[in-house]
Structure formats: C-alpha cells, structure tokens
UniProtKB/Swiss-Prot annotation:
UniProt record, GO biological process: D-xylose catabolic process
Enzyme Commission code: 1.1.1.307
The keyword Nucleus belongs to this UniProt entry's keyword annotation: no
Chain residues that bind NADP(+): 167-168, 216-225, 272-282
Protein name: NADPH-dependent D-xylose reductase
Species of provenance: Candida boidinii (Yeast)
Catalytic reactions of this protein: xylitol + NAD(+) = D-xylose + NADH + H(+); xylitol + NADP(+) = D-xylose + NADPH + H(+)
Free-text domain note: The Lys-Ser-Asn motif at positions 272 to 274 is important for the cofactor specificity for NADPH over NADH.
Length: 321
C-alpha cells in the first residue's frame, strides 16, 4: 500500500499521505517510523522543534539497511525553528538536522513559523522551543523573512535540501515572499480541519502553484494531551453529528472522513498513529469519495477556531492577526 503522489512546482513528487512526527514519543519513535515504512508510508513530516529527529533517523536508516526501502523512495521533511532565522544560523540548523537524521539531504525544509527569535546555541539548549537565552524573557531577532528564505535557497543550491516551503504563513506574507524569492515555496503547511478551513488561503496558494499540506486534521483531538484551553469549549470532531453521520453513510471511521475531506480537495495530510491497523487505515483514505453535499456540510462547520496560535503562547506574537 502506498500514497498517491503530488507533483510540486519544481517537478519533484511528494506523497499526498504522510506520517506526522509531532508528539511521537522518543522511546518508541524509531520503531514507529520503521513500522510505518513497512506498511507503506514514504513521507515523514518532522521538525527541529519536535525533539525526536535522531529517533526518526534511526527508524529510517534501519528500514534502508534492512532493504525495506531505498533512500530515494522516501520523502523526509524537517522545519527550521524560530531561533535559527539568521543566515548563519540556517546553515547550523540544516547541519544539525542532517546529523540527527543521519542523512545526506532532506526532501523538504519548511520555515516553521514566520517568527525570528533570538539565536540560542545548540550546545546550550536544543531544541530551544521558546527559550531565548534569558529566562522567560522573549527576544526577537531583527531578520526579515526574505533574508532567511535566501539562506534556505542556498541549501537547495548546495544539494542539502531538495525543496523549501513555508508553514503557518498568511496570504500577505506569502505574497511578499514571492516578490523577492528566487526559488518559490513548493509547499505551504497550515492548520486545517473543519473548524478552521481557511478556504481563501488555500485558493491563493493554489493559484501561485504552491501545494498545501494540512496539519492537525482532527482539530481539537491533536491538542487534548496538551491541555489546550480551547479544547474544553468545543465538540470533538470524532463525535460531531455531521462527521459521524457521514462516516456511517460510508461505513468508515470519522477519522477517515476528516482525512478524505482534505485529500479529495487536493491537500496533503500527515496524520500519526502508534497502532499498525490505524497506520494502514490512514493510507487507504482515498478508496471512497465524499459527495459534493457532504463536502459542503463539513466545510460549513468552519468557525475560525485556531489552536496553534503564537498570540496565545504568552508573548502576543501577531502571526495571524
């Protein structure tokens, strides 16, 4: 079983269904990645900030060594964290990523957020998360996004990265970046679920030839274990009457409806699971179609509910306002 492929604006192929590495426990990560490759996953969406790239690399390299897959058949993703936006820091970041993954290159490198924090040396704290080197004090770095992007373009030219992309960007920032870039973003990764559809942003990205990957496809479910305050105020999508009724009509689990709603509209998805049967089930989401009426019913659930918002991190960062 394998995922359908999407053709990026640089001609490279990207699996439409991948495995998201966010919150995958370090203790079981390598084994989980290995098992995911065994059942057919080829795209692994990771990040510096996830703190598990060494384990992801262990799983990937074991699968390659055991002959389950060739490196060129995989699509490995990482993301540049906020503390590494200075051009010199971008080079340090990719070296760290490749070292942790034990790979010579990655297939896609996102700018994780359009936020430049103060640089924190790797040996001091890694991943730094929201630490800026001075207790709880938040410090920005005076580095424009285009400056960071040009340093990322150099990674492509040097063969360390095949494609570069953007994550958590709004339309105006994308437009500004396109005015000055040499290499256009190949992919935009955004929070996307029925409570936060962002149709105009998706339409704009598509008109610019930028593929869209959805994260947190299950909405509040992704944030339950983080004790996110907004989770308490909304119905889980797995139990929402609209989703469950559509799932019953197709005799599939609610999760499959949520993922198919995205892929049927051309988006890529990156769900995760530690259970083999769910891993396989998530790969098979394109074996049925939702009706136009069902697609519209799901989209009608949109209430603009964003869970991953830097403004709520305690530092009033104006990413989405």
């Amino acid at each position: 079983m394998s995922s359908p492929l999407l053709t990026l604006n640089n001609g490279l192929k990207m699996p439409q269904i991948g495995f998201g590495c966010w919150k995958v426990d370090n203790a079981t990560c390598a084994e989980t990645i290995y098992e995911a490759i065994k059942v057919g996953y080829r795209l692994f969406d990771g990040a510096m900030d996830y703190g598990n790239e060494k384990e992801v690399g262990e799983g990937v390299n074991k699968a390659i060594k055991d002959g389950l897959v060739k490196r060129e058949e995989l699509f490995i993703v990482s993301k540049l964290w906020n503390n590494f936006h200075h051009p010199d820091s971008v080079k340090l970041a990719i070296k760290k990523v490749l070292s942790d993954l034990n790979l010579e290159y990655i297939d896609l490198f996102y700018m994780h957020f359009p936020i430049a924090q103060k640089f924190v040396p790797i040996e001091k704290k890694y991943p730094p998360n929201f630490y800026c080197g001075d207790g709880d004090k938040w410090s920005f770095e005076d580095v424009p996004l285009l400056t960071t992007w040009r340093a990322m373009e150099e990674l492509v030219e040097e063969g360390l990265v095949k494609s570069i992309g953007i994550s958590n960007f709004v339309g105006a920032l994308i437009q500004d970046l396109l005015r000055g870039c040499k290499i256009r973003p190949a992919v935009l990764e955004i929070e996307h679920h029925p409570y936060l559809v962002q149709p105009r942003l998706i339409e704009y990205a598509k008109t610019e030839g930028i593929h869209v990957t959805a994260y947190s496809s299950f909405g509040p479910q992704s944030f339950v274990e983080l004790d996110h305050p907004k989770v308490k105020d909304c119905t889980t999508l797995f139990k929402h009457e609209t989703i469950t009724s559509i799932a019953s009509a197709h005799d599939v689990p609610p999760a499959k409806v949520l993922l198919r709603w995205a892929t049927q509209r051309g988006l890529a998805v990156i769900p995760k699971s530690n259970k083999k049967e769910r891993l396989l089930g998530n790969l098979k989401i394109n074996d049925f179609d939702l009706t136009e009426a069902e697609l519209e019913k799901i989209e009608a659930l949109d209430i603009g509910l964003r869970f991953n918002d830097p403004w709520t991190w305690g530092y009033n960062i104006p990413t989405f306002i």
